[in-house]
Amino acid sequence: TLVHADPSWPAIIARVAASGGIDVTPEALVAAERSIAPEIARRFAAGERHTSSLPTSEAFWTWVYDGLLSECGVDAGARPAIAHECHVAFNDFASWRAFTDTAPLLEALDLRRAEGLHVGVLSNWESWLEPLLVHMGIASHFDALTVSGEVALEKPDAGIFDHALAAAGLDRSTAHLAVHVGDSWSADVAGARGVGIAPVWLDRERRGAPDRLASTTTIRTLADLPALIDAGLVKA
């Protein structure tokens, strides 16, 4: 929602592979991701949570990278080392950049924080998210950070939303006063709605809501958010 792999996750993996003498293209990796996506979804549906600790994160992501490389035809003997180096690369702060609409949003929300608005991060991320945000110079814009790698719960689990509500001085009985913005329909929209928080779906890629019957506030850019909040147009 706020940051992205720079220049892109396929480009980073292709670069790491090239450093090991393996030629894979970003386009091939995107196609490979579509192939392994059903298995990733199955594992999530079965309750697997991959950011709850650094060891589980490494195990999950190296499995993902190995699967992507396998789909691209990389030899089994070469894959483990490349998958490990991919994990190292994505843990490097230099691999991440804030979206162009992040800074303007945070500046706009700072004005509202001065009037009493609580602004927090609720993220499925490893425990190094806060140092990353400090490195990017944006951590000071938030009143609280609720990170799956620190609380050992992941969206859409209700418990992590309870942690975020508590950080804002709220609970389930006052959850309707909160707004949660995210770019994952299952983790963010469904998860927030499940505990009574008003969801806003950030659909940068204009994918369209998968649940056509659900009335959900949708934005294409974070720049649209402050006006919606000010107008009270976001409903639980």
Regions found by a protein language model. Name each.
Residues 1-100, 104, 115:
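N-terminal helical cap/lid subdomain that shapes the substrate entry/recognition surface
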Residues 27, 74-79, 103, 107-108, ...:
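Asp-based, Mg2+/Mn2+-dependent phosphohydrolase catalytic module
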